[in-house]
Amino acid sequence: MSFSVASRVSYFGTTIFAEMTQLAIQHNAINLSQGFPDFDGPSDVKAAAIAAVEAGQNQYAPPNGQPDLRRAIAVHAQRFYGQAVNSDTEITVTSGATEALFAAVTGLINPGHEVVIFEPFYDSYVPDVIMAGGVPRFVPLRPVKHALRERSVEGAQPVLSDSEGSKDAIDWVFDPDELAAAFNNRTRAIIVNTPHNPTGKVYSQAELETIAGLCQRWNVIAISDEVYEHIVFSGVQHVRLAQLPGMAERTVTISSQGKTFSFTGWKIGWAIAPPDLTLGVRRTHQFITFASSTPMQAAAAYALALDDEYYSTLAADYQHKRDFLAAVLRDAGLHVSIPDGTYFIMAGIAPLGFDDDVAFCRYLTTEIGVAAIPPSAFYSDEHKSLGQAYARFAFCKKQETLERAAERLMRLKKQ
């Protein structure tokens, strides 16, 4: 006898991250697919976690989060964005940003509500909406060539060359009219991810103002996923959506310590929202995980207070890794889209004779020994073709790991 899964999850399969990681393990490939560092974050942050354990902070934390961490999150919001946040009523600590996303969607979306989602999207967005009974409305980010901006790419010309030899760079942009058409009286929320996984796009102030205007016109909640907030390059500024006029009262801002401090396994995230929206997050959170790891919360509070040098060095180190991998991918024959943020690079595979990202990533893993992610997994069926011409590579790795990957990627030139 066998049993079927619940209908609400029958739509879902194994995540592409799990699939590609398993394939990488089977073929002893270097894993540039999943976005986790192969190095630890700051040693003093680890020491803070150990000290918390040894001090006996090993029982349940308050469901909404340890007061010290909530205060640290509030101070961080003021320090970097000038955002005044009440740590008692407007901050909820969760087991990673993914739980914060689920809690926000589940706690604020009713069956039949529509949720606008940009694609490509982080792969939990759509399942979250569907499990809440919501209806996703997709708006694609399309790759558009534009005049070259100044970029620093070590060891390579900072340009993208198409088959005709023209020199252009790529932006991933939405059509404002297409976005406006996605809003209606059934629209309850929009999910915005900036800096954006997988494209590396950092939404401009003007783009965020367009989004904000539609949210206010249609009385829509914004769920802003900002986990890569401190990983931006070349003087590009990350603008928090809640900073814009009229948006603080309708925005759930989500972030975590995993990306900023390189401890993805600790799973400490948070949601900042006005009290009425926080209520929905907290009512859901209490019945998912109830509370998050107590000693890891103590360490996260310590980490958030690190000096400005830590944050600037983080971005500079990742920019160096970005530049190295971009040069390697270009030299290997791929068409590179230089990211302004995150630790991912989207690379066009057409110059290598591929038009199917899944086939390419499987070939790359099994034959070349480097794993990447096929980004078509981050699109709806309607727009899946937009992702099939690319592969996503993660550069959140030790330099020696990237150099070993580079040696293998050079085999592509010989194919």
Regions found by a protein language model. Give the residues of each.
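Conserved AMP-binding/adenylate-forming core of the ANL superfamily
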Residues: 69-73, 96
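Glycine-rich loop-to-alpha-helix module at the N-terminal edge of alpha/beta enzyme cores
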Residues: 32, 55-59, 72-79
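PLP-dependent class I/II
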Residues: 2-5, 10-27, 36-52, 64, ...
